[in-house]
Amino acid sequence: MGSLEMVPMGAGPPSPGGDPDGDDGGNNSQYPSASGSSGNTPTPPNDEERESNEEPPPPYEDPYWGNGDRHSDYQPLGTQDQSLYLGLQHDGNDGLPPPPYSPRDDSSQHIYEEAGRGSMNPVCLPVIVAPYLFWLAAIAASCFTASVSTVVTATGLALSLLLLAAVASSYAAAQRKLLTPVTVLTAVVTFFAICLTWRIEDPPFNSLLFALLAAAGGLQGIYVLVMLVLLILAYRRRWRRLTVCGGIMFLACVLVLIVDAVLQLSPLLGAVTVVSMTLLLLAFVLWLSSPGGLGTLGAALLTLAAALALLASLILGTLNLTTMFLLMLLWTLVVLLICSSCSSCPLSKILLARLFLYALALLLLASALIAGGSILQTNFKSLSSTEFIPNLFCMLLLIVAGILFILAILTEWGSGNRTYGPVFMCLGGLLTMVAGAVWLTVMTNTLLSAWILTAGFLIFLIGFALFGVIRCCRYCCYYCLTLESEERPPTPYRNTV
């Protein structure tokens, strides 16, 4: 019987599952080797030595080789719901999940990772090209009535946007995305370019031109609606219900802006409509890049800026019920975005404080822009050639300050970087102060000029506070620099073991 218990030399390791009789084959490897023993038959260890030398199995073997006592809730692969693996039916594995710890390829990150979808087919080219064809046909029909420069400008704009639409479509297909913000932006810009062509080519005298442009605008409007619906459906699992409501409200704002642009024939209101539409598009792209948290707060700030632009149109222009309704929609959208973002942010108090400071700076800058526009509009007819250049220079400084503020919002709330946003705000405050100081020097409407100077100073202080007083003290204060430069006394090493 002793010969039956001998382990032949050179034999391989036993299988981890053991013998069919129930003997644990892994315990044979704990016997001493034949070369190290004095006899041919090694002495098996007793129960205490066997328990002390026994090593626990690897973590990944425990669920699969266990007896079911410790893992009673573990469900074998054969009894799992087959609907979990419907996406793997055509992978040559008969719809079963891939075996554990044998990834399908080098790019697999999980043992049950579904096979990635192939590259998407690009968006149907006839759907993209159709409105552009109607648009180009309308431009060709206007050759007998419109000027050469108008026809050349409209044709170049149409071809450029058609090329941009093709690039956006190929980008969406290469990135395996159903829709991208670039595609939405291109479609909306195309729609407004068609409306602009309708305005500059005097269509009431040409019924064919009117029909072609109306067909092009209608097709592009339907395309925008379909893309937004597909975008909501594609991200319905990741986006919250409030975010989807925000997208629907954004679409309502776009429609109301179109109505406002059609009804208002004032150049001032047209320019303000273009500014507010640009801010809304930037807010929409920023919101798409980060549906929750910082991106949503930045979108709320840009939407608030668009609402202030429309409010400026109410102050400088005529009262319009459509614009008032749009302001209510934008204000509701701002509240929804702030509530949806702060509910998911752990540092909601800090973010709300920074949002409040940014909103306060936005109000100050908007008031400075309105005051500058009032100064320029009041003194435009009575200005001489020597006074026109300083006024235009100050107004350009205020416009650059507004652009810097938008860059600050996009930098901080889009990327989360808290350094460059306050720096841009400080620069905008300095430019506003320079504009107010120049207007105050030439004694042009002293009260408004003093307010512009004060608003610029307050914006600079807000940017300085957002940058951080402690950070500025650390970078500029001599005492703080001295403290940081001092070497700490070395602590003796004590071995207390």
Swiss-Prot record:
Origin: domain of life: Viruses
Region (Disordered), start-end ranges: 1-108
Keyword Transmembrane: yes
Compositionally biased residues, Polar residues: 27-41
Cytoplasmic topological domain residue ranges: 1-123, 169-177, 233-241, 289-296, 340-354, 410-422, 471-497
BP-aspect Gene Ontology terms: symbiont-mediated perturbation of host ubiquitin-like protein modification; viral latency
Extracellular side: 145-147, 199-211, 263-267, 318, 376-388, 444-449
The UniProt record lists the keyword Phosphoprotein: yes
PTM description: Can be ubiquitinated by human ITCH and WWP2 on the N-terminus in a lysine-independent manner.
Regions crossing the membrane: 124-144, 148-168, 178-198, 212-232, 242-262, 268-288, 297-317, 319-339, 355-375, 389-409, 423-443, 450-470
Position of sequence motif PPxY motif: 97-101
Keyword terms of this UniProt record: Host cell membrane, Host cytoplasm, Host membrane, Host-virus interaction, Membrane, Modulation of host E3 ubiquitin ligases by virus, Modulation of host ubiquitin pathway by virus, Phosphoprotein, Transmembrane, Transmembrane helix, Ubl conjugation
Pfam families reported for this sequence: Herpes_LMP2 (PF07415)
Misc. comment: In healthy individuals, EBV typically establishes a persistent latent infection in which the virus can be detected in resting, nonproliferating peripheral B-lymphocytes. These latently infected cells express only 2 virally encoded genes, LMP2A and EBNA1.
Protein family: Belongs to the herpesviridae LMP-2 family.
Protein name per UniProt: Latent membrane protein 2
Organism listed in the record: Epstein-Barr virus (strain AG876) (HHV-4)
Lineage: Viruses, Duplodnaviria, Heunggongvirae, Peploviricota, Herviviricetes
Gene: LMP2
